[in-house]
Structures are given as C-alpha cells and as structure tokens.
Amino acid sequence: MSDDFRTRAALERVAATHGLDAAQAGALSAFVELLLGWRRANVTGLTDPVAVVDKLIGDSLALLSVPQLRERGTGAWLDLGAGAGIPGIPLAVAVPAATVTLLDAVARKCAFLEAAVTASGLTGRARVVCARSERYSSSGAPGRDAHAVVLARAVSELPVLVELAAPLLAEGGVLLASKTRRALEEEGDAAAAAAERCGLAPEPPVLLFASPLDEAVCAVFRKTAPTADWLPRREGMAAKRPLGA
C-alpha cells in the first residue's frame, strides 16, 4: 500500500471524525505535505505521513471537543510557541469563524508558518507574528488583552504557560494547554498558584483521548481579572523563576 494512499485514508478518517468537509480535508492535506517537505525548519521529527496525520492533525482536532473552545469559536485565538503550526493551523482550518495568530520567536519556524498559512488557504484568517510572547503582550503592544483563546502544546511547563498567557488573554478568555495526565498531576499545583497571582482560575481539565501509556488532557484556565501592571515579566523570567515554584 503506497504512502499516498495511506495518508489519504488517514486524512479522510480524521476529517470524518471531526465533521470536516472535502475542502477542509484538502487544506489539511496540503499542510501535511508541507510539514513533511520542510526539513530546514526542523518543525517535526516525524517522517511517516500517517503518524503526522494521527499525532499532529488528529491530536490538534481533538481540542474541538473542549467546551471552552466551542464557546469562543468566533473570537481571536493565539497559538503560543506555534512552531509547526500545531494545533493552530488544523484548528483554523476546522473553525472558519476564528481568526488565529501563530506566535513564535524562531525565524526559521516563522518562515515555515508563513508558508503553511498560504498552503492551507488561511490567508486573511491566520497570521504569523515572529516575536517573544513577553514583547507581544507588553503594555501598549497589539497582543495585550487581545485574545479569547490561547492555545499551547509542548511549549513549556504549565506554570510558565499560565504566566505567559495571562497578558495575552482578554478577560473571560481561556488558556487551553494540551498535557499528559501525568504532567498535569505533576505541574497542576504550581500552575494553580501561578494562575492565582496572574488573575486566572483553573477549570476542570478535559480528557482528549487515552493511549496505552497515558491520557491526553486539556488543562483549562480562565482569565478572571484585568492584567496586572507587572505582567509580563522580563523575557525569560517566567521559565527561569516560575511563579508557582
């Protein structure tokens, strides 16, 4: 069985699972082809097309089951540390009413993201910002208090994500961070402490799917207070001196 046939079958299965139409499936196919071909950006270590569909596209679209994402489906979303465009680009394809900012500080990854936006037919609905989150969310910056949803996957530990997301979110907005159940148990208390200082409140995590080794969950934090004047801290401080430590 050829790779093309296997990839097409995997995409059709994922698209059907999440109610996507043929045009959306085609956009995801173009994105997968770009992911596999764009070696210089080092955006993914996966080389098997079916693994890319299942682990990157499928895992991204699993977030569609999160109620807090559905309630914010027409707002401005931001993918924090977007890297390979996961989960931001698949979700932008799946939810046409959302506008998505793909934020990353690494130039070669930003170049990939620009190409991915074009290949996926998202010009005008998704844009790339090449900057650190602290700079993009600083006082007077366009990203401050501007987003209904901040998405994060495999970027940093949860207390760090909470602090970085806080000044990016509008009041009432939500941070949705994909984690394993084990990581959430290890990082949850520190993340809750960081959230309290940053004006966010944890909500019950949402199970995305189970694997033989662990469960994938979405950690949810809602912004309940205005952004504090001291946020964001200096670049790198969230990771160097986590608030919940």
Which sequence ranges carry the predicted segments?
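Class I SAM-dependent transferase core
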Residues: S2-T74, R108-K109, A115-G121
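Conserved class I S-adenosyl-L-methionine
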Residues: R72-G83
